[in-house]
Amino acid sequence: MADDSNDTATDVEPDYRFTLANERTFLAWQRTALGLLAAAVALVQLVPELTIPGARQVLGVVLAILAILTSGMGLLRWQQADRAMRRHLPLPRHPTPGYLAVGLCVVGVVALALVVAKAITG
């Protein structure tokens, strides 16, 4: 493991407004993760069975996994941005919004297909 003792000597306290903005962004990621987790629980517990048995559970698990990844990646993003601000480095780009968007689109398309199939078959 690398020794971080020399890295901390170059850290500078950033403007508090940037620190608070970074924290607000982190909290927004956590709210998104909580919303995904609530959607997963609601899907599994409240939605009637769809055309394919077990489809609710699979979609619920996918949403729960997205929630866990969103929460973890939000924390990672917060740490990376904080470190960059303290060292006067450019803010790192992060692929998390793209992953989240693709995951939600896949869940949405599958859910739509299942609902349409249920409506057609009765």
Curated annotation (Swiss-Prot):
The chain crosses the membrane at residues 33-53, 58-78, 97-117. Keywords: Cell membrane, Membrane, Transmembrane, Transmembrane helix. It comes from the Bacteria. Its main location: membrane. It is a multi-pass membrane protein. Pfam families: DUF202. InterPro entries: DUF202, IM_YidH-like. GO terms for cellular component: plasma membrane. It is found in: Cell membrane. To E.coli YidH. This is Uncharacterized protein Mb2295. It comes from Mycobacterium bovis (strain ATCC BAA-935 / AF2122/97).
